[in-house]
Amino acid sequence: MHVKQGDTVKILTGKDKGKIGEITKIIKGSNQVVVQDINVKKKHVKPRKEGEIGKILQFEAPIHSSNVMVYNAESQVASRVNYQKDESGKKIRVFKKLLNTN
């Protein structure tokens, strides 16, 4: 998957298009991600026991990973990620849009 937990991403499609948030959870089986404060849904919960009251829960629903792109806050640009090796041979992630500017 092209994104990791903790990445800052920009939403490309849907009702939250253009918003920026951080990935809090990754669901690998379905290639979905949960982004903080994005795609917030409400669920109405009926009371289960006598004397209990109903609730309205808010939660962040997952969105497909193809609908997000990694966001660079320093240059304020969303870009795909390329992998390169540094001097010590360690793999690092580099923004493709920033490769052409250097």
From Swiss-Prot:
What Pfam families does the annotation carry?
A: KOW (PF00467), ribosomal_L24 (PF17136)
> Where found in the cell?
Plastid, Chloroplast
GO MF annotation terms: rRNA binding; structural constituent of ribosome
The record's gene field reads rpl24
Alphabetized UniProt keyword annotations: Chloroplast, Plastid, Ribonucleoprotein, Ribosomal protein, RNA-binding, rRNA-binding
How this chain assembles, per its entry, is: Part of the 50S ribosomal subunit.
Question: What is the official name of this protein in its record?
Answer: Large ribosomal subunit protein uL24c
Q: What does this protein do?
A: One of two assembly initiator proteins, it binds directly to the 5'-end of the 23S rRNA, where it nucleates assembly of the 50S subunit.
Q: What is its main location?
A: plastid
Cross-referenced PROSITE patterns, in alphabetical order? Answer: RIBOSOMAL_L24 (PS01108)
Q: Where does the source fall among the domains of life?
A: Eukaryota
What InterPro entries is this protein classified in?
KOW, Rib_uL2_dom2, Ribosomal_uL24, Ribosomal_uL24_CS, Ribosomal_uL24_KOW, Translation_prot_SH3-like_sf
Q: According to its record, what are the GO cellular component terms?
A: chloroplast; ribonucleoprotein complex; ribosome
What family is this protein classified in?
Belongs to the universal ribosomal protein uL24 family.
Species, as recorded: Rhodomonas salina
Q: Which GO terms describe its biological process?
A: translation
Gene3D superfamilies given in the database record: 2.30.30.30
